[in-house]
Amino acid sequence: MEKKKYSKRYCRYTEAKLEYIDYKDVEMLKHSLSERYKIMPRRLTGNTKRWQERVEVAIKRARHMALIPYIVDRKKVVENPFKI
């Protein structure tokens, strides 16, 4: 079997020179979530370790504040979960 090679990805937060990630900005957080609202790993998003940790904390805060659901039903999985 051949190993999958991932293309080189760059951290969008480092390039944007952000100071912090706001948990209320769901549009920015959706780039780090899968269609089932799971947090995507660094190798897929291209985030640095520092920003990945900050994204995880922001997503967990947004979930706690009910801005993002914890789980999604299989039947309700859509192409873009933020346009329901």
Swiss-Prot record:
Q: Which SUPFAM superfamilies match?
A: Ribosomal protein S18
Picking any one GO molecular function of the record gives: structural constituent of ribosome
A Pfam family (short name) is: Ribosomal_S18
Oligomeric and partner information: Part of the 30S ribosomal subunit. Forms a tight heterodimer with protein bS6.
Question: What name is this protein filed under?
Answer: Small ribosomal subunit protein bS18
**What phylogenetic lineage does the species belong to?**
Bacteria, Pseudomonadati, Campylobacterota, Epsilonproteobacteria, Campylobacterales
Q: Which NCBIfam families match?
A: S18
The record, for Gene3D superfamilies, names: Ribosomal protein S18
**Family the UniProt entry places it in:** Belongs to the bacterial ribosomal protein bS18 family.
One biological process term from GO is: translation
Mind telling me which residue stretches traverse the membrane in this protein?
none
PANTHER family linked: 30S RIBOSOMAL PROTEIN S18, SMALL RIBOSOMAL SUBUNIT PROTEIN BS18M
- Species, as recorded: Helicobacter hepaticus (strain ATCC 51449 / 3B1)
Q: Which domain of life is it from?
A: Bacteria
UniProt function note: Binds as a heterodimer with protein bS6 to the central domain of the 16S rRNA, where it helps stabilize the platform of the 30S subunit.
Q: Which UniProt keywords apply?
A: Ribonucleoprotein, Ribosomal protein, RNA-binding, rRNA-binding
GO cellular component, alphabetical, reads: cytosolic small ribosomal subunit
